[in-house]
Amino acid sequence: MTVTADTTATDRVTPAERIAVRCVDSDVHPVPRRGELVDYIPEPWRSKYFRSHRVGEQIFYDAPDYAHSYAMRVDSFPADGEFACSDPDLALKQLIMEAGSDIAILEPIHGEMRIPEATAAFCTATNLWLANHWLDAHNNWHERWRGSICVAIEDPASAVAEIETWAGHP
């Protein structure tokens, strides 16, 4: 018999003891919900560059000859119409509770901009979004998500600053 935890309950309590780590899923790519990322982009880049582009609203080629799920589980798309892996509760249910992973490494995918400083601003926004929407006390109450950071390799100074900012964060 399989028992699945109700992840929508309000009694999200940090576990009293840690589990033994047997299986780590290192291929989890959380995606922001539509419009969620833009508020995290630092100025002046938010107004100057990203307000003229749709940030976090991905448009994919979806012709009948192309797989709708883009190599993702078809059932990983939430019922509200958002993109796959945009719902931490659904990801917890599928990756941890059902698939049996003990820990999941979150690796948000970010796009490269044509201007290195814009890429750095987008990486900063992605890291802040991940911390606030996946690694926060509400969504990581089970302490099984681990974050990774995005850095702009085109801008080494900002990459170092971003690494130093997030050093020690889960």
Residue spans of the language-model regions?
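Helix-coil boundary/capping segments in enzymes
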Residues: 1-170
